Amino acid sequence: SSSRYYVFDSREVATIYPGLARRFDAYDFDIIHSQTQFSLGVLAHWVAKRQNIPHVTTIHTLYTELIDDYPLAVLSGLLALSVAFPVALKSQPVLPRVHRETIKHLNKRDMKTALSRQGWRLTAAFANKCDACLSPSQHLARILIDDGGLTTPCMVLPNGLDSTRYRSARAADSPIPKAPGEKIIICVARLSPEKRQMTLVEAMPHLSGLPVKLVLVGPGPSQEELGRRAEELGVADRVILTGKCSPEEVAVLLKQADVFSLASYHFDNQPMVFLEAAACGLPIVYCDERMTECLTERNAILTDGIEGEDFARVFASLLSDDARLAALSEGALEVAQQFDSETMTRRLINLYEDLLVSYH
């Protein structure tokens, strides 16, 4: 069963209860791999313990960076996990490390830091009950170790991509008209505050002298707000909100575009869309200095700041230089080859095999 959880816009969250793990006794599992550290992660822990099999968990994203957008929800979630984890995992309590004398002097920034650290300590506490932990990026692994106290072996395993769909996609199949000489900036992501598409919309007035469109691909709660902001800024005719698209449609839109951009900051880890963009030969413009996987000087540009005008400066320079665009596009295709899904799958299978040997 499931219930509504208000942190992420009332998404469905699995409901677990004591005794649920027994229902899986009929299945002859060799290994358990959880992709979340919340209710289903706890269920995975219970099943692995009952069946005496290895438990691997993947930590996908920087959950605590949602504090700015969902402060009360994240705070309540941290409090709930601080109480629930010691009971569900039979572990020591994970208490916040804030000295009582400093609490009354905490400002907003200090409070966010304390909450973030507590979030990573809880995440690491879960991972420390597993046999292995996977992180898609080096910087996330370092946060887990330094801020969370992770001691379980952690493998950095970047996302892999089967590029077949992107190689076969044709720009000519796009429903979006593109005039000769016109350039397209594209962002593929859920339309929500943490993805910061508003920053890209606010870059567009600074590009009024260039024939350029911004295509925002994906559904989400911010769609209407983004449309209104484009109207206010007088760029609605150059900002296209596609809504939800199929994977095949996304591939076509990426093939048609000239630049991929993502404005999320200290939230994402190793977004799959970076790999998809690289597979289509798209240069990437981003602002989060902590993201490194799939981002090199050969295919990506890090902005000097995180605001719309910072992105606009990079866009204006890049879109006016066809030679640089071509060089970055070639570099993107080369980078994408390093993240072949078969290579990443083999590394994961090797980990599974090593764990199974250690259990028998």
Regions found by a protein language model. Give the residues of each.
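Acidic anion/phosphate-binding donor-loop and adjacent secondary structure
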Residues: 145, 161-176, 349, 359
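Nucleotide-activated donor-binding/catalytic signature segment of Leloir-type glycosyltransferases, i.e.
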Residues: 227-245
